[in-house]
Amino acid sequence: EQKCLFTKGQIIEIFQDIINPNAPKITQVVNEGQLSIIKPNVAHTMVFTKDTTFLNLVRGERDHENYGITHTIKHIFVDEKEKNLLLEYYKFDCRSCGNNDLKRVVSLGYQPLANNLLKKINEKCELYPLEVNYCNKCHNCQLSVSVDPRKMFTNYLYTSSTSKVFREHFINAAKQYFKHLKLNKKKSYIIDIGSNDGVALKPFLDLGFKKVLGIEPATNLAKIANKKGIKTFNGFLEKKNLKKIKKNADLILASNVFAHSDKLKEMAECMLDLLSKKGTIVIEVQYLMNTLKDLTFDNIYHEHYNYWSLTSLVNFFNQFNAKIFKSEKVDTHGGSLRIFVKKDKKVKIDSSVRKMLKDEENFGIKDFKTYQEFGKKIYKIRENVLRNFKKIKEKNKKIIGFGAPAKATTALNFFGITKEIDFIVEDNKLKHNKFIPGVKIPIKNKSQIKDKNNTLLVLAWNFYNDIKKNNSKLSNNFLNIKDLESNN
């Protein structure tokens, strides 16, 4: 073991266990005054982000029993391109509060961009660290890198309307907001941020609302929405675009997009700028507490820069003198959090906020040990899945995946599962004849399933019951990928 004390500067260290073939490549920031500890049998290198001075700490005299014997072997595992990617995209401070002493929760290795499916099997794709860090000041969780959003959202293949579950979710949500927020069908102006193909705004039009606007950066999805008659602005929500967007919204929706912004404060400022004095912002995010409790690590991918609890969201919005006045849990994405926000500092805070904050504190949302335990359990899950996969293949079972959501890219790349799955079928036609990046598993139409004796492994596990019910003719054997995670 070797220790280095950094007396000046900053580095990104990259290391990988060379004994364990499944070990991920991991990055870690070392700041001034901190130690770098290099374990035996580990490939290790440093990317210097500043002028840096460090001391090698050695026990005792240099003249020891191994003196003069080479115990470090040259092993290049970070090239110039990777170094430049790290320097460009690494996030050194908390995007919520600015704290630069972030703690590592889990590393899922270097992974491709989850929704950037390959058009050809030999097409190259860039890999980026997929790692979650924790801020012990505001309790925000975020990725260690922030990939340029234009690489992920300019041409987006995920269409929310493909899922009946999501269509029904947004229909019910629209009815709820109409009733409880006392909206007016003729006068109320509704904006949806990251509106996709218009799935959340269509129910408002169906209810008779006249003034709706979607804001969607993916050109292909904005075109789909506009063709449906759902007025959509094609672009990111950022200050330079505000002059192109009508203001004084009575309701602003942000469903599963608030985690998708690296420029988080700019996004919040834009939303508050577009909001009328008495208007309401409703935000839905995947709920961090569900991720930690249910071990749904596959909800981690590069599009999701942030992972939110109510605790961290309250801390965030307090910076803008905006108040979360109501909170509730919803079932989407394996467990989500919905919050209601107003500019009015005197707004009455619903008891749901106090109760949820107390529940989070009791769970340990402010205790780093909670996050460390989560990380340990995720590595154990990988061991279990690989062992259980091997058992299935030993029975000469042909495995076909069902569903190619972003979570499938994360899980399959983390597990290192490639040829063990023959192919994947998908309801979304935009994904047909493409390949999962990294593992290069082909995605096909359901018509390619010819034998009911095949095992259908449901990768879109949050829709398992619906998939099994609606596709019973395809297979006699459905298996939820979550069932492979147990230690059987």
Per-segment meaning from a language model:
Residues 18-39:
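Short acidic-glycine-tyrosine-enriched beta hairpin
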Residues 1-12, 16-18:
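Glycine- and acidic-residue-biased ligand/ion/polar-headgroup-sensing regions
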